[in-house]
């Protein structure tokens, strides 16, 4: 029997062994996990993986072969570009642009442009892109996704295609997940672009319209996904061209593309206005939900994340509320009660959200970060507020919205970078039409990923995790423990407190978030133990031996902030009383033992002098904390500056980093010899990709490292999605502290996770299919709106005549049945409708229409009325412009924009209701998506007709006053002045 067949037989035989009563387990000593690395069935899995690789080939090798010729061509230009002076290198940008103007394409320039950027990066940053980074840049330029492992230099890679595509003058957007990364990349990588003669822009929260306009007008713009999306929506609410900040889209590079296009795909960007909702109903519903019993009054579907009232629940709710119908649209009690039960059963404190004061703050399930300012929609957030007894905020109404799926597909070319994309190839291809290419690593990966250790119960799992941490801590290896929630991270912390093992806790709690950089800076040090909620999106590499750069920054921050930041009210009170000890003197101090060594006397004096210089230049205690943090960040980067304080702080930062590096480099050698960073996973995520992100924290740039996941059959993933096989194992095993070993089990766990991935992919795909309907409507509405916003007088007149003609068609079709004889047409009623529409039609009566209709039929009647409508419009233009020149143009533009905005807002509410309603039609054997498309199209057609009718009617009814008096138009326009707020 072959090894493969033998291994398979052992897997198949497992169930029979269990049935016979002898559970196949591995007894362990000391750690409770030692035997787990020899999980039965692993040889089969390894051989299957090997066969698959032989059949399909190594994707990284395929990528290398595909691009190697162009990489060699770039390398061949190295000597030539190195010989150029700075001025000659910069002149290459002018040369490239001239060649583009003469008909060359950016593809024609790729090899030369990449060689120029590589040389510029070497001169400006001291970093020379490796061959694999050139490959990554080529992949991005082709509009694909480059999968590059953690620590492979994705940030530098983006400079290559950004420069090349910016040569056209149409702009490039480099998108990051937060403001800090956008600013860091603009200041750091932006130096390359500026050195080569390109402009580099930055968009940050809180910027003015003019600052945003300048940023988006630059050749390369660094911006977060949310700022970019909200600016798009605000531009499509602008009341004048002077409010527009973005130009036409060209090329976009997304960093952490999986986070934005997949994890954020279900979260639309929404600009909303306030709408009153009675908070008493949320409170009443919360009380009823609290009194109701699960599985009697209602059922919970954790997989679908939904709840369903039982008959008993319906009757009890109607009795308690004294209503006859929970679904009465006038009261909508069903919605309040369903949300209250969801808040009780599905939204867990310290898992899905945290409570800070009187505020409910959502925790991002993927990154473990708090999502300040984000709120659940459709009343769910208010239901959670009622559950927790905090202030209930008003409901909102959507004014404009867009999903990231729809928004980023509007770019002519889109590329992305991430460390984990291969598992989502299908989604990137089917939804975004993006291919994924795996970039080879610069150095071979030497991390060891151990087989999962699986226990029957959570008790056994946590005991094993505890022992594993203790074992690694005694060895001296740094340990990173990944958890899926705040609650779980604190549970592990309690266990380590009992064992006397020091640790750092990094989760969404405010006190821990504030120390994030401090915690990450030392996570790679000897014997460090770090417990963190999902590390996805943390954006910082863990450096073995400690991060000297981060620690140097923290040392400068500790000394600078207490001298430069404005005191808070409480501190001022203490200072006035002369109690400086309580005036926040230690507010910025880090925990004892963070720094690897004391500063030398010379560097300590240098630090003191730099802080004094900053106080002298900026003013003692003169800056807000955020402004001070931004200045410190800039001082610790390499951006050009002539600010004396920035230069002094930068010099001492560099000096401290040099001293710290002596110690961190020595400690790194020790940690490397011990085996590097050990990562412990405590639960499989809904996506293998997020698990891989945690694993990827270890083994950076060829460093040694190891990972191991500790699981239990009671984990949510397997409890909800595991199926009959895992339930059978739960019944078969009774020993809690022994790991279960079985190839069948491992395969079942893998299948459960794949099932979850498929399930959530199907949800996102369904959302995408539905959103495609709304997105096509959005694009048409925004096109018409922008057409009016930017139109000349002649263009507006053409648009108005088009509206007038279509409106007359609507009136004729609504009042005349063309299939009947013209002699029987109710022309008197038609005349009455026309007079309501425009008072100029008062000059027309039935006797004018009857001969036209009887002689030429319906088409002649339409042509006659259209001609009269054009005459009426021209007379109205003359009447209005006689009061003030170009007043008619302003009025027309205002009416089109205001009617479009108001009716689009109503349309968003209506189509949202349709989407909720069509789901039930599946029970009638109808396709909900087709039903949604049909009803959505009807709603859209009626909305566009309503916009036209309202605009034309408003124009004809507009009666301008003389210039010395305020006109209704000006007053109405003033109300729109602040419409660009989120």
Which residues does each predicted region cover?
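N-terminal mitochondrial targeting presequences
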Residues: 3-5, 34, 38-49
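Intrinsically disordered, low-complexity segments enriched in Ser/Pro/Gly/Ala and basic residues
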Residues: 7-10, 22, 36, 364, ...
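Intrinsically disordered, low-complexity segments used for protein-protein interactions
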Residues: 12-16, 27, 46, 613, ...
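Conserved P-loop NTPase motor core
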Residues: 44-734, 783, 801
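Extended, charged helical/alpha-beta scaffold domains that provide interaction surfaces
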Residues: 353-361, 367-374, 636-639, 672, ...
């Amino acid at each position: 029997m072959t090894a493969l067949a033998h291994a398979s037989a052992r897997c198949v035989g497992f169930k029979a062994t269990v049935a016979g009563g002898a559970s196949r387990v591995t007894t362990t000593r000391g750690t409770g996990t030692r035997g787990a690395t020899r999980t039965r069935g692993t040889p089969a899995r390894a051989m299957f993986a090997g066969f698959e690789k032989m059949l399909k080939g190594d994707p990284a090798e395929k990528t290398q072969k595909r691009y190697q010729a162009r990489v060699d061509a770039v390398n061949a230009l190295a000597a030539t570009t190195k010989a150029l002076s700075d001025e000659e290198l910069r002149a290459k940008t002018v040369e490239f642009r001239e060649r583009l103007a003469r008909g060359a394409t950016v593809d024609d320039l790729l090899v030369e442009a990449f060689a120029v950027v590589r040389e510029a990066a070497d001169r400006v940053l001291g970093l020379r892109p490796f061959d694999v980074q050139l490959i990554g840049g080529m992949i991005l330029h082709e509009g694909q996704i480059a999968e590059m492992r953690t620590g492979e230099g994705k940030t530098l890679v983006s400079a290559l295609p950004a420069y090349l595509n910016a040569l056209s003058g149409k702009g490039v957007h480099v998108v990051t997940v937060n403001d800090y990364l956008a600013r860091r990349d603009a200041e750091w990588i932006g130096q390359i672009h500026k050195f080569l003669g390109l402009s580099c822009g930055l968009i940050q929260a809180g910027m003015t319209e003019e600052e945003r306009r300048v940023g988006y007008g630059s050749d390369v713009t660094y911006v977060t996904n949310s700022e970019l999306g909200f600016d798009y929506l605000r531009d499509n609410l602008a009341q004048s061209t002077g409010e527009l900040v973005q130009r036409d889209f060209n090329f976009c590079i997304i960093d952490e593309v999986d986070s934005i296009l997949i994890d954020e795909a279900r979260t639309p960007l929404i600009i909303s206005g306030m709408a009153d909702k009675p908070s008493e109903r949320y409170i009443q519903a919360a009380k009823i939900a609290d009194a109701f019993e699960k599985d009697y009054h209602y059922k919970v579907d954790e997989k679908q994340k939904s709840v369903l009232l039982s008959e008993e629940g319906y009757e009890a709710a109607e009795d308690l509320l004294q209503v006859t119908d929970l679904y009465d649209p006038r009261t909508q009690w069903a919605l309040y009660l369903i949300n209250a039960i969801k808040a009780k059963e599905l939204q867990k404190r310290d898992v899905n959200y945290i409570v800070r004061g009187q505020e409910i703050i959502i925790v991002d399930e993927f990154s473990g970060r708090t999502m300040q300012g984000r709120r659940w929609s459709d009343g769910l957030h208010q239901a959670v507020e009622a559950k927790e007894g905090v202030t209930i905020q008003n409901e909102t109404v959507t004014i404009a919205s867009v999903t990231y799926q729809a928004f980023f597909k509007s770019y002519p070319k889109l590329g992305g970078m991430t460390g984990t994309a291969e598992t989502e190839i299908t989604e990137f291809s089917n939804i975004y039409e993006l291919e994924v290419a795996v970039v080879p690593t610069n150095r071979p990966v030497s991390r060891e990923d151990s087989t999962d250790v699986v226990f029957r119960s959570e008790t056994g799992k946590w005991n094993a995790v505890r022992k594993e941490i203790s074992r690694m801590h005694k060895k001296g290896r740094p340990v990173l423990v990944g958890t899926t929630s705040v609650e779980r991270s604190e549970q592990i912390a309690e266990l380590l407190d009992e064992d006397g093992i020091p640790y750092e806790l990094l989760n969404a709690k405010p006190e821990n978030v504030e120390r994030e950089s401090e915690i990450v800076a030392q996570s790679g040090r000897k014997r460090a133990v770090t417990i963190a909620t999902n590390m996805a999106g943390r954006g910082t590499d863990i450096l073995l031996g400690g991060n000297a750069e981060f620690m140097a920054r923290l040392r400068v921050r500790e000394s600078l902030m207490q001298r430069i930041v404005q005191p808070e009210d409480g501190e001022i009170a203490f200072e006035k009383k002369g109690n400086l000890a309580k005036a926040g003197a230690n507010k910025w101090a880090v925990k004892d033992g963070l720094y690897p060594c004391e500063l030398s006397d010379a560097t300590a004096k240098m630090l003191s002098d730099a802080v004094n210089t900053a106080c002298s230049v900026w003013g003692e205690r003169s800056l807000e904390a955020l402004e001070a943090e931004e200045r410190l960040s800039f001082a610790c980067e390499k951006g050009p500056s002539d600010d004396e304080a920035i230069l002094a702080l930068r010099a001492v930062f560099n000096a401290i980093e040099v001293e710290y590096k002596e110690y961190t480099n020595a400690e790194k050698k020790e940690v490397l010899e011990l085996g590097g960073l050990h990562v412990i996973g405590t639960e499989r995520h809904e996506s293998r990709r997020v698990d891989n992100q945690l694993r990827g924290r270890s083994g950076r740039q060829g460093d040694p490292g190891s990972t191991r996941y500790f699981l239990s059959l009671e984990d949510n993933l397997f409890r909800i999605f595991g199926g009959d096989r895992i339930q059978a194992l739960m019944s078969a095993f009774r020993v809690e502290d022994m790991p279960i070993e079985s190839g069948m089990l491992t395969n079942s766990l893998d299948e459960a996770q794949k099932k979850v991935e498929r399930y959530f992919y199907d949800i996102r795909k369904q959302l995408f299919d539905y959103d495609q309907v709304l997105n096509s409507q959005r694009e048409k509405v925004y096109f018409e709106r922008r057409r009016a916003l930017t139109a000349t007088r002649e263009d507006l007149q053409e648009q108005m005549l088009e509206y007038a003609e279509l409106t007359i068609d609507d009136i004729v079709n609504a009042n005349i049945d063309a299939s009947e004889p013209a002699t029987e047409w109710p022309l008197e009623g038609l005349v009455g409708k026309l007079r309501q529409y425009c008072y100029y039609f008062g000059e027309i009566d039935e006797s004018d229409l009857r001969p036209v209709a009887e002689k030429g039929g319906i088409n002649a009647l339409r042509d006659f009325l259209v001609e009269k409508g054009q005459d009426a419009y021209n007379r109205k233009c003359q009447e209005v412009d006689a009061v003030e020149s170009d007043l008619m143009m302003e009025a027309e533009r205002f009416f089109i924009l205001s009617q479009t905005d108001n009716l689009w807002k109503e349309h968003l509410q209506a189509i949202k209701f349709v989407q909720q309603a069509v789901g039930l039609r599946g029970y009638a054997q109808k396709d909900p998506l087709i039903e949604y498309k049909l009803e959505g199209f009807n709603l859209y057609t009626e909305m566009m007709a309503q916009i036209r009718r309202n605009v034309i009617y408003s124009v004809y009814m507009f009666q301008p006053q003389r210039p010395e008096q305020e006109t209704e138009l000006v007053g109405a326009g003033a109300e729109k002045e602040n419409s660009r707020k989120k």
